[in-house]
């Protein structure tokens, strides 16, 4: 198999990528086709659907991306994405990174085959001289992730109201409160597209830190987003944005 496209998002590094799609519903993404598949006829009728399935590839244990950004992950001493080796049991973030579950009962990236499956909202299809561009929302993918297939979400086949969520139902995710001063919001809007601010705030709500991170209220974290460096601290349940550069 070979990629048919790559998705471009505002998250170039592993740090900050939502742990599932739709946790940051306003996070923007653009799917750019490889020249062989950049044909208007290939997407005819796609804009009649509201949601899509994306099949994609994990690279080095994380959604794919540029080598420089993967190296930046390693420089932070987060080794969780440094190898693609799979393990039969994993520690899901939703369980605080402590309890284990079987890999096939989770969506861990450390699998026998590095295949990812994501549902996204279709915003619109743009036809350009270079080929169609699919604009999506709510993806949980790093910038540059290779896409292997795109399929429409079909409600009568894909939606199962009676479905149960297993152990996840007993482990609700706790979001952080985000303190984002007005002057820093204005600075973000001056340096980047204002429409990207809502997605950033949603990413911060999800707590970008590793599951089980110890309480270090004075530690300054840095999130790469939309070409900017967003600095913040976390004190208990509140994330404080300190700077946008």
Stretches with model-predicted labels:
Residues 1-119, 123-245:
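Glycine-rich, low-complexity intrinsically disordered segments
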């Amino acid at each position: 198999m070979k990629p048919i496209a790559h998705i471009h998002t505002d998250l170039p590094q592993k740090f900050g990528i939502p742990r599932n799609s739709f946790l940051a519903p306003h996070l923007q993404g653009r799917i750019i086709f490889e020249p062989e598949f950049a044909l208007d006829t290939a997407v005819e009728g796609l804009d009649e659907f509201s949601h899509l399935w994306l099949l994609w590839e994990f690279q080095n244990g994380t959604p794919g991306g540029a080598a420089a950004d993967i190296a930046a992950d390693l420089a932070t001493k987060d080794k969780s994405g440094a190898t693609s080796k799979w393990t039969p049991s994993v520690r899901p973030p939703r369980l605080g990174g402590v309890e284990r579950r079987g890999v096939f009962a989770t969506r861990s990236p450390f699998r026998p085959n590095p295949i990812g499956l994501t549902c996204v909202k279709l915003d619109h299809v743009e036809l350009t001289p270079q080929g169609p561009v699919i604009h999506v929302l709510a993806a949980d993918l790093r910038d540059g992730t290779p896409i292997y297939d795109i399929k429409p979400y079909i409600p009568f086949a894909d939606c199962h109201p009676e479905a149960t969520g297993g152990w996840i139902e007993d482990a609700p995710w706790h979001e952080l409160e985000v303190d984002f001063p007005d002057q820093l919001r204005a600075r973000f809007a001056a340096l980047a597209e204002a429409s990207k601010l809502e997605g950033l705030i949603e990413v911060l709500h999800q707590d970008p830190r590793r599951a089980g991170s110890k309480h270090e209220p004075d530690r300054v974290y840095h999130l790469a987003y939309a070409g900017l460096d967003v600095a913040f601290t976390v004190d208990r349940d509140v994330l404080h944005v300190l700077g946008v550069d």
